Amino acid sequence: VLILVATVIHGNERSGREAFQRFFKILTDEKLPIRAHIVGIQGNIEAWRRNVRYVDEDLNRLWTREHIRRIRMGAFHPRTREEKILVKLVQAIRHYRSKLRPRQLIWLDLHCTSSPRGTFVVSTRHHANLFLASQLRIPLVLGLDHILHGTAIRFFSEIRNAVSLAIEGGQIGDPRAVHVHHAVIWTALKAARLIPREYFDIVAPHEKFLTEISEGLPHKLLVRYAHFIDSTYQFKMLPGFRNFDYVRKGMLLATQWDGPVYAPISGHLLMPLYQPQGGEGFYIAREIKH
């Protein structure tokens, strides 16, 4: 099994990088016998140095089939910083897959949101993805892969024998997001049966932590609406909204160049945008009861 832990795909979402470094130190210091090859991926280092989401364009919207096909053919000519990074990442991943020939690949993409209470896992509906996601003890969000194009988890979910999840650790800059990402890595390893049973006691506190921070939140949601924007929209979210807040149809949520923005449907608010960069102002999801 090859596990790729992706960090700073968005440069200002820094907790995943720190969490992986913490995880890797424990792994090497304790010499734990993990049944997998684990590789940390540092995505947009240029954006990380500047502490911004991206420099030229969103790296997590570039993982399209056409881009990957052209990179593999040597026919992709990058124009932006993020396109150059994409080429390096695709080539590095191809190298590890070719060298190790794993029976399974697991892509864990560590992110944060610009709004409070943003701890959840994003998955596609593929069975293997759903199984692993359901073991992480945090809310599960479905449907984003049909709304957002060019994301890494969508690309990896279409690879044979691959599992891909995006983990939102919490609000950008919140120290607890580091703990969430660290806990998720350990919990995912146990769920994938890559840790010997005699080491389960190492994972137990992480599972307890994830269960506690998810208390009172919906277990499973389906995204039903995305409010797309660009830099010309002058979009501004009203202050005070948090992830999972319940909003009713017609409720005032934001303003933009053409006037007020009202909730088009009722549901749980996800990822309300409180940073200058981003292509989506907010999402609305509905809880899946069954």
Feature annotation, model-predicted:
Residues 1-290:
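Structured catalytic-domain cores with a bias toward divalent-metal coordination
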